[in-house]
């Protein structure tokens, strides 16, 4: 490495700044132009103020899209209520008849 003049500020060291100015091109070569170009173009990182996007205005024909949902009856669960009790009784009878040892 070449010795650097200690009186120079770090941003004025030779090779610290590119010879050409930054531009708006997003090609691969321009994206790697300098650290700033790489961060903004290559990585998409910018710390500037973000522009506020305007919301789209609603079309004049639609009102507020607040149409109520029509009430629907809750589905009734249908099935044998005694079916589960019968299966429990079968399991109990099997456990009683099976010897453990």
UniProtKB/Swiss-Prot annotation:
<dbReference type="Pfam" id="PF00539">
    <property type="entry name" value="Tat"/>
</dbReference>
<protein>
    <recommendedName>
        <fullName>Protein Tat</fullName>
    </recommendedName>
</protein>
<keyword id="KW-0899">Viral immunoevasion</keyword>
<feature type="region of interest" description="Disordered">
    <location>
        <begin position="47"/>
        <end position="101"/>
    </location>
</feature>
<dbReference type="GO" id="GO:0046872">
    <property type="term" value="F:metal ion binding"/>
</dbReference>
<feature type="region of interest" description="Interaction with the host capping enzyme RNGTT">
    <location>
        <begin position="49"/>
        <end position="86"/>
    </location>
</feature>
<comment type="function">
    <text>Transcriptional activator that increases RNA Pol II processivity, thereby increasing the level of full-length viral transcripts. Recognizes a hairpin structure at the 5'-LTR of the nascent viral mRNAs referred to as the transactivation responsive RNA element (TAR) and recruits the cyclin T1-CDK9 complex (P-TEFb complex) that will in turn hyperphosphorylate the RNA polymerase II to allow efficient elongation. The CDK9 component of P-TEFb and other Tat-activated kinases hyperphosphorylate the C-terminus of RNA Pol II that becomes stabilized and much more processive.</text>
</comment>
<feature type="region of interest" description="Cysteine-rich">
    <location>
        <begin position="22"/>
        <end position="37"/>
    </location>
</feature>
<dbReference type="GO" id="GO:0044196">
    <property type="term" value="C:host cell nucleolus"/>
</dbReference>
<feature type="site" description="Essential for Tat translocation through the endosomal membrane">
    <location>
        <position position="11"/>
    </location>
</feature>
<keyword id="KW-0007">Acetylation</keyword>
<keyword id="KW-0479">Metal-binding</keyword>
<comment type="function">
    <text>Extracellular circulating Tat can be endocytosed by surrounding uninfected cells via the binding to several surface receptors such as CD26, CXCR4, heparan sulfate proteoglycans (HSPG) or LDLR. Neurons are rarely infected, but they internalize Tat via their LDLR. Through its interaction with nuclear HATs, Tat is potentially able to control the acetylation-dependent cellular gene expression. Modulates the expression of many cellular genes involved in cell survival, proliferation or in coding for cytokines or cytokine receptors. Tat plays a role in T-cell and neurons apoptosis.</text>
</comment>
<feature type="binding site">
    <location>
        <position position="33"/>
    </location>
    <ligand>
        <name>Zn(2+) 1</name>
    </ligand>
</feature>
<feature type="cross-link" description="Glycyl lysine isopeptide (Lys-Gly) (interchain with G-Cter in ubiquitin)">
    <location>
        <position position="71"/>
    </location>
</feature>
<dbReference type="GO" id="GO:0050434">
    <property type="term" value="P:positive regulation of viral transcription"/>
</dbReference>
<feature type="short sequence motif" description="Nuclear localization signal, RNA-binding (TAR), and protein transduction">
    <location>
        <begin position="49"/>
        <end position="57"/>
    </location>
</feature>
<keyword id="KW-1035">Host cytoplasm</keyword>
<feature type="modified residue" description="Asymmetric dimethylarginine; by host PRMT6">
    <location>
        <position position="53"/>
    </location>
</feature>
<keyword id="KW-0010">Activator</keyword>
<dbReference type="GO" id="GO:0039606">
    <property type="term" value="P:symbiont-mediated suppression of host translation initiation"/>
</dbReference>
<feature type="compositionally biased region" description="Basic and acidic residues">
    <location>
        <begin position="85"/>
        <end position="101"/>
    </location>
</feature>
<dbReference type="GO" id="GO:0039502">
    <property type="term" value="P:symbiont-mediated suppression of host type I interferon-mediated signaling pathway"/>
</dbReference>
<feature type="binding site">
    <location>
        <position position="27"/>
    </location>
    <ligand>
        <name>Zn(2+) 2</name>
    </ligand>
</feature>
<keyword id="KW-0597">Phosphoprotein</keyword>
<keyword id="KW-1122">Modulation of host chromatin by virus</keyword>
<dbReference type="GO" id="GO:1990970">
    <property type="term" value="F:trans-activation response element binding"/>
</dbReference>
<dbReference type="InterPro" id="IPR036963">
    <property type="entry name" value="Tat_dom_sf"/>
</dbReference>
<keyword id="KW-1126">Modulation of host PP1 activity by virus</keyword>
<feature type="binding site">
    <location>
        <position position="34"/>
    </location>
    <ligand>
        <name>Zn(2+) 1</name>
    </ligand>
</feature>
<keyword id="KW-1114">Inhibition of host interferon signaling pathway by virus</keyword>
<keyword id="KW-0014">AIDS</keyword>
<keyword id="KW-0922">Interferon antiviral system evasion</keyword>
<feature type="short sequence motif" description="Cell attachment site">
    <location>
        <begin position="78"/>
        <end position="80"/>
    </location>
</feature>
<keyword id="KW-0964">Secreted</keyword>
<dbReference type="GO" id="GO:0006351">
    <property type="term" value="P:DNA-templated transcription"/>
</dbReference>
<keyword id="KW-0805">Transcription regulation</keyword>
<dbReference type="GO" id="GO:0039525">
    <property type="term" value="P:symbiont-mediated perturbation of host chromatin organization"/>
</dbReference>
<comment type="subunit">
    <text>Interacts with host CCNT1. Associates with the P-TEFb complex composed at least of Tat, P-TEFb (CDK9 and CCNT1), TAR RNA, RNA Pol II. Recruits the HATs CREBBP, TAF1/TFIID, EP300, PCAF and GCN5L2. Interacts with host KAT5/Tip60; this interaction targets the latter to degradation. Interacts with the host deacetylase SIRT1. Interacts with host capping enzyme RNGTT; this interaction stimulates RNGTT. Binds to host KDR, and to the host integrins ITGAV/ITGB3 and ITGA5/ITGB1. Interacts with host KPNB1/importin beta-1 without previous binding to KPNA1/importin alpha-1. Interacts with EIF2AK2.</text>
</comment>
<keyword id="KW-1048">Host nucleus</keyword>
<feature type="modified residue" description="N6-acetyllysine; by host EP300 and GCN5L2">
    <location>
        <position position="50"/>
    </location>
</feature>
<feature type="region of interest" description="Transactivation">
    <location>
        <begin position="1"/>
        <end position="48"/>
    </location>
</feature>
